[in-house]
Structures are given as C-alpha cells and as structure tokens.
C-alpha cells in the first residue's frame, strides 16, 4: 500500500521517537526528507543524520538531541501543507514561528530552506512544517 503523505509520516516518526526519548529513528529516505533532516541538524534540533543505502530506496536515520537533564530539544513539530490542502506563501508573508524561537521549513524554487533564509532571499514557497 502506498503512503499518501510520506513527509507527515517522517515528521510523526520523529515526534513519536522524541516523546518516547529514543536515541534515533529510521524512515524510508527521499530527497525532501534528507533536506528536512539537514535543516533540523543545522538549526540544532537533532544531533545527527545518517543515510543508509539498502539497495532499494535507502534509509534515513535521525539521531535525536536531548538536554543534560533529558529535556527534549524539539518541543513541537507540525505539518502545515498537506496533500489535500497545499499551503503557499509569498515572499512578504513568510511566517515566523513563536516570534522567531521556532522555524518554518519552506520548499522554494531554490530548494528546501528555513523561514529566515526565505525572508533574506525574498522568496516564497510551500510551507512544509513548523518546528519549535
């Protein structure tokens, strides 16, 4: 059976593993998922990301990050643009998540970027998710 929204599945796997205090989580790989994982790593929400080639689609392994006292770094993940209701923003309407404390992940003509990069480059696109 095919999955209707693989990005939502990826974000849900991260959210559930994070809530259960797991060390890492695996998901089927895709270019979009790799880009999202790299953004989460660069923004400090996850510790590391690893790609495993299994002679098929590949697997993306995300290593979650926690504070010294076990406090979760990712307090929330929300899918915004869904297959049934795509959400696009113009360059002058790029959202701020929690007044800049979180990030919006946006798919633009220049690749998958954060809201800060989209605002700096003055480009809009499809709002994939909010992370805070």
From Swiss-Prot:
<dbReference type="GO" id="GO:0003735">
    <property type="term" value="F:structural constituent of ribosome"/>
</dbReference>
<keyword id="KW-0689">Ribosomal protein</keyword>
<comment type="similarity">
    <text>Belongs to the universal ribosomal protein uS8 family.</text>
</comment>
<dbReference type="GO" id="GO:0019843">
    <property type="term" value="F:rRNA binding"/>
</dbReference>
<dbReference type="InterPro" id="IPR035987">
    <property type="entry name" value="Ribosomal_uS8_sf"/>
</dbReference>
<dbReference type="GO" id="GO:0005840">
    <property type="term" value="C:ribosome"/>
</dbReference>
<comment type="subunit">
    <text>Part of the 30S ribosomal subunit. Contacts proteins S5 and S12.</text>
</comment>
<comment type="function">
    <text>One of the primary rRNA binding proteins, it binds directly to 16S rRNA central domain where it helps coordinate assembly of the platform of the 30S subunit.</text>
</comment>
<dbReference type="GO" id="GO:1990904">
    <property type="term" value="C:ribonucleoprotein complex"/>
</dbReference>
<protein>
    <recommendedName>
        <fullName>Small ribosomal subunit protein uS8</fullName>
    </recommendedName>
</protein>
<dbReference type="GO" id="GO:0006412">
    <property type="term" value="P:translation"/>
</dbReference>
<dbReference type="InterPro" id="IPR047863">
    <property type="entry name" value="Ribosomal_uS8_CS"/>
</dbReference>
<keyword id="KW-0694">RNA-binding</keyword>
<keyword id="KW-0699">rRNA-binding</keyword>
<dbReference type="InterPro" id="IPR000630">
    <property type="entry name" value="Ribosomal_uS8"/>
</dbReference>
<keyword id="KW-0687">Ribonucleoprotein</keyword>
<dbReference type="Pfam" id="PF00410">
    <property type="entry name" value="Ribosomal_S8"/>
</dbReference>
């Amino acid at each position: 059976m095919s999955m209707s929204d693989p990005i939502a599945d990826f974000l849900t796997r991260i959210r559930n593993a994070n809530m259960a205090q797991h060390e890492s989580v695996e998901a089927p790989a895709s270019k979009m998922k790799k880009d999202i994982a790299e953004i989460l790593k660069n923004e400090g929400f996850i510790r590391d990301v690893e790609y495993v080639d299994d002679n098929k689609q590949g697997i993306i392994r995300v290593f979650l990050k926690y504070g010294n006292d076990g406090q979760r770094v990712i307090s929330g993940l929300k899918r915004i643009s869904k297959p049934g209701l795509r959400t696009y923003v113009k360059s002058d309407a790029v959202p701020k998540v929690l007044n800049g404390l979180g990030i919006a992940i946006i798919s633009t003509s220049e690749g998958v970027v954060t809201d800060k990069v989209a605002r700096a480059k003055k480009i809009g696109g499809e709002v994939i998710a909010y992370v805070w």
